[in-house]
Swiss-Prot record:
Description of how the protein assembles with itself and partners: Oligomer; forms a ring structure at the cell surface which is important for efficient partitioning of daughter cells after cell division.
Signal peptide span: 1-29
Taxonomic placement: Bacteria, Bacillati, Bacillota, Bacilli, Bacillales
Protein name: Bifunctional autolysin
Localization, UniProt: Secreted
């Protein structure tokens, strides 16, 4: 169910590192694992634009509320253009009557500025209801010659019966019953029941109520806070959306868009903020995520409510919307938060066709608390939000009463606050009878695009004024779009047959998947095409528009005669074996032989390449790595320039042969800088600056720049002062989709992004507090938290873990039992002492344990050491952590006995010493008592022995040999430099170690150890100091975040950021350095090792050869590619991965030939299994191996090769600090580096290719 309300498509996060289809539910909110078996075919399609996401669009600004409805025109009739209609413009005739409304105000309450409760969410299948007696001649299909038709209603003729209210449309809402004021149910115990959801929500029809006055709502409970909310007519803020693309999307148990109710939660964190809670959730979504957060000022929706979230346990998650109340601390803020929550809850109930029905006392209803879910449904044991509400002298019954009142107001059943009467319900909806047309302005423009009508749609409209559309079977086909029309807040496309031009009708924007298209061009080109490839009657055609399939065996010749670009894809029309049709260029291979291009001489125009020059209005930043500045585009080489990472104006664009150039100049003067190659700049379109006269507020410390979209090299100064300062803007320019303003603040002038500016709020009148006193909520001042350095083992029998020492009841701590953790904090509370346990990497807090549940020892400071040891025959194994238990062993004692252990650091634990180092390609801790320092042995010539390890060739000037130590049979390593070398034998000859193994071309050879490296590390100079980049990050509007205690996110300090960005420090850590691992570089991990890791992973088992081939073909790190496939397939168990066929547009799982899709490519949310299998079938993926190799190309281009190819670059973007970063958590790259390191450890390998930025 697509919803239209301030929707923004979320930014795609390129990294998919961890997770599986079966993920643990929220540690704090639900402790059992959800069985997603029934939802295996509902995939999270974060790699593609799902069709449901494409239906989302932002609702236009509310138009004026005008009395009346539109005149209905039969959509089946297309009126021909009459002879006297010379212009073809849509005609509007106006007839206006005066409507009157009883304006009496509600008793004991003052009239307020707005008598409506706005609907926060809506979608469109019906024409918008309007409220003016106006008759319009419909805009007809044939009346489309004039692309600028406008219909205006004379505002002087309109006498509004009410103040402005939002015009919105809605569907899938339930028909309201008679006006009721449902009270909370009696507190009686009953047998737990299950709420069932109707298979279909009937459209609700609400006409203007015939009564002249609606009844006031009669509260069912006494509440001073609710009275305060009502008296002051508190308004709920607009719902913000902060969706995260990598959150999983699973249907509710009744299907997508069918929740059965809403659950009230509170965050249980007295010190957090709404931003902190959301940031924490995003970084820990594998444990829990909810739909929305509410505080006193904001409502932020964090996940689409059409899909379930993980917030209330395995039983409740498939049923309910989960919303968290963020703690506030004063009377007014708490009241606003209750108002905001009630408004959001009422909006959800109304939108999904549900009525308020409290489940608190009988386990049956639509409004639940977390406590009620625990009591009646199980799967969780939490009791919120009762404790938090009580702390503010409030109760769930009062909140439910407020939700019920809000709902009835929205449904037009009781009078809105501040008024006694109304003639229309506040929720605009489908009118019961046709009346007058929309009063919105009509604009029509030419369009040259294509569209596919969705299966669920509002129908075809003969005119854009029609109340309803006519049902159509022309769905999931590609049509040409020739016109775009906007009427009020509705947008329509005029669709027509692509080949004949026959018009079908108007469709609503939300009912189609639309793509831009360029005009077709004639071509004359031959390609090769594989047999079985589908040809289509139209470009971007669907399964309903197949013209035929390529016959024959072996590649066939496709002769293309026409080409068209749809969005960013190229389609060609041509003939093959007597069949003609369209096909994507991705399925064609150019058979033309490449023609060598003559090398142009410097400053001499080439005679073979055509030069085209055109004017351009844009801006560009020259990359740090570039080909220099060119005086003319004919120059062979450019001149080096220091003008990098600065913003310049672009005035010209030139194309010469296969190269494209931009002419850059100083933004503020006529000075030309020179020509630069397109690939050497980051370019953005720019509109011409316009003069403005506007005052804003800006925070102190905000940077001003000498140019719009300026860099750190173009800072004009920073805003001084304390508190918000006044910024007087005089000029504005749009760069790409961002707005920049030039102005002055405190004597300094410069450009600043509009995102950092705020319009000054109008002064508000003080509102008197209600007389009802609120009891003081006091807490005994706790003792000071002490920082300690200790280590602890959790006892098998323990009382559990707490998020805070103030929690009276601990959560189950069984999963931490008999394991060792670092201890960083200690605090006494009452008569008990608690310590904060951190994970094995020191820096991620897990929670607080009572010291009675632990065995604690002092932990010394880690000291570097470089020493080789022999592991004793009797030993305790290699552990993840010093003093680790049997549950934390990486390699058992038998696996490392008498092996060589290379130590790099040591630490004392109590009276023992533990050393950290490497053995058998694995790193971990060994007790010093289990090690013996070997005596020095003089190197001697030895016989060749088996040795399995993959090195990297580091010396391109070295040689490989047929036999070791041969001076004659040797060959250059230049062609194999920086490539893997899989060693199988080792031999020492005269003190020189030789390795025998396989080169990347499959040839076996001997190579000296001095020409090999265990890893290849490259260092890149950033041109900046660590202080500079840390200052940029710390100065961002959305500050980097740090978590010092569990669940509490705070703005990171400058030193936190600098510490997290310190590449020298990170590179020294064996696990943290994996944030520099290149994800776009395969490293030839052996097929046997991959297969061993994939054992038990469903259809991915024994697919090591396919992953190896895919990594080599498309340049992707094997570990990253495997992790992506495991996530998408639920460890190889999803139906999409196991395979199926699509026959007659239906999924068949028992067919002889099955098609597989292991990366979820094209598995659109509206029907992921069918769409994903269709894509796989079209691609010919009839084996799992083909799906792995074929899908890897998409993964490589869409994720790894998007530019930021390491975790460090994804988090900090050292090339452009502060822009396009994937997280705010300063520890994000560290966490994911350890996860990837963990995969390597499980496979028994180590990373080979690292790219480390260096600061001056």
């Amino acid at each position: 169910m697509a919803k239209k309300f301030n929707y923004k498509l979320p930014s795609m996060v390129a990294l998919t590192l961890v997770g599986s289809a079966v993920t643990a539910h929220q540690v704090q909110a639900a402790e059992t694992t959800q069985d997603q078996t029934t939802n295996k075919n509902v995939l999270d399609s974060n790699k593609v634009k799902a069709t449901t996401e494409q239906a989302k669009a932002e609702v236009k600004n509310p138009t004026q509320n005008i009395s009346g409805t539109q005149v209905y025109q039969d959509p089946a009739i297309v009126q021909p253009k009459t002879a006297n209609n010379k212009t073809g413009n849509a005609q509007v005739s106006q007839k206006v009557d005066t409507a009157q409304v009883n304006g009496d105000t509600r008793a004991n309450q003052s009239a307020t500025t707005n008598n409506t409760q706005p609907v926060a969410k809506s979608t469109s299948t019906t024409a918008p209801k309007t409220n003016t007696n106006v008759t319009n001649a419909g805009y007809s299909l044939v009346d489309d010659e004039d692309d600028n038709s406008e219909n205006q209603i004379n505002p002087e003729l309109i006498k509004s019966a009410a103040k402005p209210a939002a015009l919105e449309t809605q569907y899938k809402t339930a028909a309201p019953k008679a006006a009721t004021t449902s009270a909370p149910k009696a507190k009686t115990e009953a047998t737990p029941k299950v709420t069932t959801f109707s298979a279909s929500a009937q459209p609700r029809s609400v006409a203007a109520t015939p009564k002249t006055s609606l009844p006031k709502y009669k509260p069912q409970v006494n509440s001073s806070i609710n009275d305060y909310i009502c008296k002051n007519n508190l308004k709920a803020p607009k719902i913000e959306e902060d969706y995260t693309s990598y959150f999983p999307k699973y249907a509710y148990r009744n299907g997508v868009g069918r929740p059965e109710g809403i659950v009230v939660h509170d965050t249980a964190n007295d010190r957090s903020t709404i931003n902190g809670e959301i940031s924490y959730m995003k970084n820990n979504y594998q444990n829990a995520f909810v739909h929305a957060f509410v505080d006193g000022d904001r409502i932020i929706e964090t996940a689409p409510t059409d899909y379930l979230s993980w917030g209330v346990g395995a039983v409740g998650n498939p049923r309910f919307i989960n919303v968290e109340i963020v703690h506030t601390h004063d009377y007014a803020s708490f009241a606003r938060s209750m108002n905001n929550y009630a408004d959001y809850a009422a909006t959800q109930l109304q939108y999904y066709g549900l009525k308020p029905d409290s489940a608190e006392y009988d386990g049956n209803g639509t409004v639940w608390t977390h406590y009620a879910v625990s009591k009646y449904l199980g799967g969780t044991d939490h009791a919120d939000p009762h404790g938090y509400l009580r702390s503010h002298n409030y109760s769930y019954d009062q909140l439910y009463d407020l939700i019920n009142e809000k709902y009835l107001i929205k449904m037009g059943k009781v009078a809105p606050w501040g008024t006694q009467s109304t003639t229309t319900p506040t929720t605009p909806s489908k009118p019961t009878t046709p009346s007058k047309p929309s009063t919105g302005k009509l604009t029509v423009a030419a369009n040259n695009g294509v569209a596919q009508i969705k299966p669920t749609n509002s129908g075809l409209y003969t005119t854009v004024y029609d109340k309803t559309g006519k049902a159509t079977n022309e769905v999931q086909k590609t049509f040409a779009v020739s016109k775009t029309a906007t009427l009020g807040n509705q947008k329509f496309y005029l669709v027509q047959d692509y080949n004949s031009g026959n018009k079908f009708g108007w469709v609503k924007e939300g009912d189609v998947v639309y793509n831009t298209a360029k005009s077709p061009v004639n071509v004359n080109q031959s390609y090769s095409i594989k047999p079985g490839t589908k040809l289509y009657t139209v470009p971007w055609g669907t399964s309903k528009q197949v013209a035929g399939s390529v016959s024959g065996s072996g590649n066939q010749t496709f002769k293309a005669s026409k080409q068209q670009q749809i969005d960013k894809s190229i389609y060609l029309y041509g003939s093959v074996n007597g069949k003609s049709g369209w096909v994507s260029k991705a399925y064609l291979v150019d058979t033309a032989k490449p023609t060598p291009t003559p090398t142009p001489k410097p400053s001499t125009p080439t005679t073979n390449n055509k030069l085209t020059v055109s004017s351009l209005n844009g801006v560009a930043q020259i990359n740090a790595k570039n080909n220099g500045l060119f005086t003319t585009v004919y120059d062979k080489t450019g001149k080096p320039t220091k003008e990098v990472q600065k913003t310049f104006a672009v005035t010209k664009e030139a194309s010469l042969g296969g190269n494209k150039f931009y002419l850059v100049k100083d933004y503020n003067s006529p000075t030309l800088i020179g020509w630069v190659k397109q690939g050497d700049v980051i370019y953005n379109n720019a509109k011409s600056p316009v003069n403005v006269m506007q005052t804003y507020t800006v925070k102190p410390g905000t940077k001003l720049y000498s140019v719009p979209w300026g860099t750190y090299k173009q800072e004009a100064g920073a805003v001084s002062g304390t508190g918000n300062q006044t910024f007087k803007a005089t000029k504005q320019q749009q760069i790409d989709k961002s707005i920049y303003l030039f102005g002055t603040v405190n004597g300094k002038s410069g450009w600043v992004s509009k995102a950092y500016l705020a319009v000054p709020a109008a002064p508000k009148k003080a509102v008197a507090q209600p007389k009802t006193a609120v009891k003081a909520y006091t807490v005994t001042k706790p003792q000071t938290t002490q920082t300690v350095s200790k280590i602890a083992q959790v006892k098998p029998n323990n009382t559990g873990i707490r998020a805070s020492v103030y929690e009276k009841t601990a959560k189950n701590g069984a999963k931490y039992a008999d394991r060792t953790f670092y201890v960083t904090k200690e605090r006494a509370h009452g008569n008990e002492t608690y310590v904060l346990l951190n994970n094995t990497s020191h820096n991620i807090p897990l929670g607080w344990f009572n010291v009675k549940d632990l065995n604690v020892q002092n932990l010394g400071k880690e000291v570097k050491t470089t020493q080789k040891y022999t592991v004793n025959k009797s030993n305790n194994g290699l552990s993840m952590v010093p003093w680790g238990t049997k549950n934390q062993v990486i390699l058992t004692g038998n696996n490392i006995a008498q092996g060589t252990f290379n130590a790099t650091k040591q630490v004392s634990v109590g009276k023992d010493v533990y050393l950290y180092g490497t053995i058998n390609n694995r790193t971990g801790w060994v007790n010093a008592k289990d090690l013996t320092a070997p005596t020095a042995v003089k190197p001697t010539t030895s016989a060749a022995k088996d040795y399995n390890y993959t090195y990297v060739i580091k010396n391109g000037n070295g040689y490989y040999y047929v036999t070791p130590n041969s001076d004659t049979a040797k060959y250059s390593l230049k062609a194999f430099n920086e490539q893997p070398f899989a060693v199988v034998k080792e031999q020492v000859i005269n003190g020189q170690t030789w390795y025998y193994g396989k080169l990347s071309n499959g040839k076996l050879a001997w190579i000296k150890s001095t020409d090999l490296a265990k890893e290849l590390i490259k260092y890149n100079q950033t041109g900046m100091t660590l202080n500079q980049v840390a200052q940029i990050q710390a100065g961002l509007q959305y500050k980097p975040q740090v978590q010092r205690v569990p669940g509490k996110w705070t703005d990171a300090k400058f030193n936190d950021v600098k510490h997290a960005m310190d590449t020298k420090r990170l590179a020294q850590d064996p696990a943290l350095k994996y944030q520099f691992l290149r994800l776009d570089q395969p490293q030839n991990i052996s097929i046997d090792k991959i297969n061993q890791f994939l054992k038990g992973k469903g259809v991915l088992e024994n697919q090591g050869a396919a992953f190896n081939k895919a990594a080599q073909m498309y340049g992707i790190n094997e570990v990253y590619l495997i992790s992506h496939a495991l996530l998408e397939t639920g460890n190889g168990t999803s139906q999409l991965a196991k395979g199926a066929d699509v026959v007659n547009n239906k999924v068949v799982t028992n067919s002889n030939t099955k098609y597989h899709n292991v990366f979820g490519i094209a598995a659109y949310d509206n029907d992921p299994l069918r769409e994903g299998i269709k894509y796989a079938k079209q691609a010919g993926w009839d084996t799992v191996s083909k799906a792995i190799v074929g899908g890897a190309k998409f993964i490589g281009n869409s994720y790894v090769k998007a530019g930021q190819n390491t975790l460090y670059k994804m988090r900090w973007n050292p090339a452009h600090p502060g822009t396009h970063q994937y997280a705010t958590d300063v520890d994000w790259a560290n966490i994911n580096a350890k996860i990837i390191k963990g995969y390597y450890d499980k496979i028994g390998e180590v990373g080979k290719y690292f790219d480390i930025p260096q600061y001056k």
